[in-house]
Amino acid sequence: MPAVTRTTAVAVFAVVAASCSSGTPAAPAAAAAPVMKPLVSVKEMMRFDIDPASDYVFDAVQYDATTKGVSDIYPKTDEDWEKVKIGAVSLAENIYLLKLKRPWTPKGDVNNSTGPNPPELSPEQIQAKYDKDPVLWDAKIEALRNAALEIMDVADKRDVKGLFEASADLDMACENCHLEYWYPGDRAAVEEDKRQRARIDPSAKRSAKKK
């Protein structure tokens, strides 16, 4: 039988010792969280996402004023309530996407901010307002989300009266944000519109009182 050299014996011992080790293998490194990159501006987000979602709510509850009087429009079927829920869930989930840093408008779009007494703010003016008080921007977003959560709740309960009130809360949250960051110069026109609507729309009257 051939002799086993000292070097060979040491090598074999090392292999056996390694294979018998009771140590646990190192856990694989956790995958890095994906970086969320906004695709569109705030203005486009509103046009293609937030506004269409809110329309599911606003279109579901209305007061139709005619020469014959005022009639209520409200959800009557499961399908009607399903549409309200779709809008509310979309709003509640997607509104937080406005917290991601993104352009205020598409490239080259300056809103209606030129000429004498422009009704809308430019992207630079909006950014200046945000930089001055970023907490306020987050508060406006939270108000919108809370209104959406309220609508989700009344949709589950099939609460018609609650839906009229919740839609008024959503409308107020939207206008409060727009008057702060989009068209503060139109505040008088908006308030006049609210007064006119309140003449026939009890939910609008309730909204005006809460301001």
Where are these regions (language model features)?
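Secretory/periplasmic and organellar redox-cofactor proteins
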Residues: 6, 21-23, 35
